[in-house]
């Protein structure tokens, strides 16, 4: 079979009938009788399969015995208009080659409904299902759209380190890395681990954010974005948390908080619009199968202007509502998802960008307002999931930043370089972070973040 392989998505979208084609993929189903057999073949390029019509008498019954659900095969045949119902295109097979069999007595993905919980246990095979094929194609197009958007905006893709000695969030939930012998660690005179003997000569961790290094890029290149993996050692075993995930973090010189909000809105609308254009079939499948409000939620974002809302005003609205919240409302709380969703879904009925948060619930690097109580932070709030973006105008004043670091009793040993950028040619700048899996979760309509990444890393689970 030396004919060039055709993708099923191309054969279905722009068919050129009555020509020889070669398709290769995995068998979804096979049915028929002693004279004719029908194979549904999928190659991963689309949620839709293509029907293969096999003349059993012509090709021989033995050639079909190993063609069961999950088998990988190649077909040479004639592309024709389908005579049956349910499909417009089919291939009349001339040749069949079997690459790999799938013993039906042990193959886990038989033709029946499989729960998402079961599929997480066989994450190495779940990309072959319609559901995860859709999710992974959407994930690809979202990633491509992110690069395309920032390139059009004149931003530079900036690579930040995965191994770091600093904690960008100041939260301490980091994975430590070392090549020291755990059973026989070298110690200092004080009995502490002697990290000068470690590989890097100091204590190092997997990064929780590329923001701090990204700011350095913005203060030289003007506008940058990062897009890479980050790691959080939070032992949160929930549908919203992963220990390893991907983050998009733009940082832009000469942007204030208003510029930052405008960028976030434009960015999100572009990405979601791109997905709806290029992932139409996949989104429709997920809408019809898992979440019949998915397309409605996506259009909700695209068709509405994002409301700008000060935190204090948001608290007032929540306090005066008649809602019975699980978590009480008062000025100074870190809003929960139920509060955010009320503002978006019930009160404003549009996405919300909340700003001017209490400084005590936000990170040290956010620019302080003149009131001394709040900072120029911002969160973009969406229906169903709540916060999707967190960002701020960054503190550009060296003395204010230094004072805030001291107030929080943070070590300056690993932040001296960050402070130096405020000493040498500082500039106003802003940025935000978007968890890629949170975005994929919203665009696919799934409920559990473990279902939107190929191989989820969670507490007590690092298989595959």
From Swiss-Prot:
A biological process term (GO) from this entry: asparaginyl-tRNA aminoacylation
Sections of the chain in a coiled coil: none
Alphabetized UniProt keyword annotations: Aminoacyl-tRNA synthetase, ATP-binding, Cytoplasm, Ligase, Nucleotide-binding, Protein biosynthesis
Molecular-function GO term, any one: asparagine-tRNA ligase activity
GO cellular component, one term: cytoplasm
Reactions performed catalytically: tRNA(Asn) + L-asparagine + ATP = L-asparaginyl-tRNA(Asn) + AMP + diphosphate + H(+)
Keyword Ligase part of the UniProt annotation: yes
CDD domains registered for this protein in UniProt: AsxRS_core, EcAsnRS_like_N
Entry superkingdom: Bacteria
Keyword Phosphoprotein tagged: no
InterPro entries: Aa-tRNA-synt_II (IPR004364), aa-tRNA-synth_II (IPR006195), aa-tRNA-synth_II/BPL/LPL (IPR045864), Asn-tRNA-ligase (IPR004522), Asp/Asn-tRNA-synth_IIb (IPR002312), NA-bd_OB-fold (IPR012340), NA-bd_OB_tRNA (IPR004365)
Subcellular location: Cytoplasm
Primary residence: cytoplasm
Top class in the EC scheme: ligase
EC number: 6.1.1.22
Subunit: Homodimer.
Family from the record: Belongs to the class-II aminoacyl-tRNA synthetase family.
Protein name per Swiss-Prot or TrEMBL: Asparagine--tRNA ligase
Native source organism of the sequence: Azobacteroides pseudotrichonymphae genomovar. CFP2
Chain's gene name: asnS
């Amino acid at each position: 079979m030396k004919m060039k392989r055709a993708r099923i998505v191309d054969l279905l979208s722009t068919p050129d009938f009555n020509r020889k084609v070669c398709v290769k993929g995995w068998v979804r189903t096979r049915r028929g009788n002693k004279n004719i057999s029908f194979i549904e073949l999928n190659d991963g390029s689309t949620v839709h399969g293509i029907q293969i019509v096999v003349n059993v008498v012509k090709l021989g019954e033995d050639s079909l015995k190993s063609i069961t659900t999950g088998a990988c095969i190649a077909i040479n045949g004639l592309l024709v208009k389908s005579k049956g119902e349910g499909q417009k295109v089919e291939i009349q097979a001339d040749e069949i080659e079997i690459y790999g069999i799938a013993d039906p007595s042990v193959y886990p993905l038989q033709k029946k409904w499989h729960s998402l919980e079961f599929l997480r246990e066989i994450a190495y095979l779940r990309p072959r299902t319609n559901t995860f094929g859709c999710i992974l194609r959407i994930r690809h197009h979202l990633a491509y759209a992110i690069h395309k958007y920032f390139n059009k905006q004149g931003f530079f893709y900036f690579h930040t380190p995965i191994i770091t000695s600093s904690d960008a969030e100041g939260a301490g939930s980091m994975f430590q890395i070392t090549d020291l012998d755990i059973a026989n660690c070298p110690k200092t005179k004080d009995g502490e681990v002697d990290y000068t003997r470690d590989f890097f000569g100091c204590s190092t961790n997997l990064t929780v954010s590329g923001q701090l290094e990204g700011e350095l890029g913005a203060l030289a290149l003007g506008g940058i974005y990062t897009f890479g993996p980050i790691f959080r050692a939070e032992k949160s075993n929930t549908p919203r948390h992963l220990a390893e995930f991907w983050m998009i973090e733009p940082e832009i010189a000469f942007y204030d908080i208003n510029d930052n909000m405008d960028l976030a809105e434009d960015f999100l609308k572009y990405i979601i619009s791109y997905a709806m254009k290029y992932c139409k079939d996949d989104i429709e499948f997920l809408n019809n199968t898992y979440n019949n409000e998915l397309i409605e939620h996506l259009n909700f974002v695209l068709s509405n202007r994002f409301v700008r809302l000060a935190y204090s005003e948001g608290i007032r609205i929540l306090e005066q509502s008649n809602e019975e919240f699980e978590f009480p409302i008062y000025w100074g709380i870190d809003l929960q998802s139920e509060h955010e969703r009320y503002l978006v879904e019930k009160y404003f009925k549009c996405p919300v960008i909340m700003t001017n948060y209490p400084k005590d619930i936000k990170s040290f690097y956010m620019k302080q307002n003149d009131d001394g109580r709040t900072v120029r932070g911002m969160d973009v709030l969406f229906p169903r999931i709540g916060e999707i973006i967190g960002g701020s105008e960054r503190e550009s004043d060296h003395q204010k930043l230094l004072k805030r670091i001291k107030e929080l009793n943070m070590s300056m040993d690993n932040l001296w370089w960050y402070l130096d950028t405020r000493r040498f040619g500082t500039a106003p700048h802003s940025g935000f972070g978007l968890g890629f899996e949170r975005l994929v979760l919203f665009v696919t309509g799934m409920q559990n973040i473990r279902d939107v990444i190929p191989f989820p890393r969670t507490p007590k689970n690092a298989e595959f």
